[in-house]
Amino acid sequence: MFNFKPLLTITLLAVSSVASAAEQALDAQQVAQLIEKADCYRLQDDSSKVVSLVRLYQDQELDKTRLYHVYTRPNRESLVVFKSAVEAGQKMLMMGDNYWLQMPKSRRPIRITPMQKLLGEASIGDISTLTWSQDYQGEWKATETLTINGQSIAAYRLALTAKTKGASYQKIDLWLSEQDAFPIKADLYLRSGKLAKQAQYGRATNRGEDYVSEMTLLDSIQPSKKTVIEYQEIVPWQLDNKFYNPSYLPKANTSEL
């Protein structure tokens, strides 16, 4: 159970690749195990409540913030409740490959895609999906060395390819720590093959357990902007089944969620 502020943020400063002719490629099963372990740093319980604060920075100055409560459960199902005053009454439901957005006073939800933007570079998919193993098939590419805060960290570079229609990205290049499979950074690609954004993952520790405290999203086209998704609270939570029904969204009272 997590209910605390991040203690440490990791920032990527430079990257250098070290290829070794003697390095051993990981097989599909080993890669799958690595991805599942990386998922555990992001979400430990299948059914959880995640309080996510999204901050948009312009030229290193805080520009806007938005708050979301995300209720996730197995089988790729999530309910996102918009908590900021400017978005009050909005809610989004993800059911597998399908996404619905409910606007205040609207009679029915509208279908959307996981790439619909919320704030800055943060999209619906970035908020509602906290795991990779269910949406992507992984492949080992190389063992590389990343230089982070002046320290060299050995990392596995994996290529993830979408295996579900509702996956936010078609392809992800993901770097995991060789020591403990903690996610370090990722390049996120659209179906067109275009690089959509880059992600960096912050590490924090509580009671001896490491977890992903935040995700920083960077856009190479607009380097003056960055979006930070901070996971302020992650707790086990069982939400009533009725909230995972798109037809219930218009009448669902989520003010207390």
Name the predicted role of every residue range.
Residues 22-46, 53, 62, 96-170, ...:
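Flexible, processing/modification-adjacent segments and terminal tails
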Residues 57-59:
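Sequence/structural signature of outer-membrane beta-barrel proteins
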Residues 70-74, 96-98, 115-119, 202-205, ...:
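A short, sequence-level motif marking secondary-structure junctions
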Residues 16-20:
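N-terminal signal peptide c-region/cleavage motif recognized by signal peptidases
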Residues 112, 151-246:
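Gly/Pro-enriched, hydrophobic low-complexity segments
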Residues 1-8:
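Bacterial N-terminal signal peptides that target proteins for export
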Residues 68-111:
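Mid-chain, structured segments of secreted extracytoplasmic proteins
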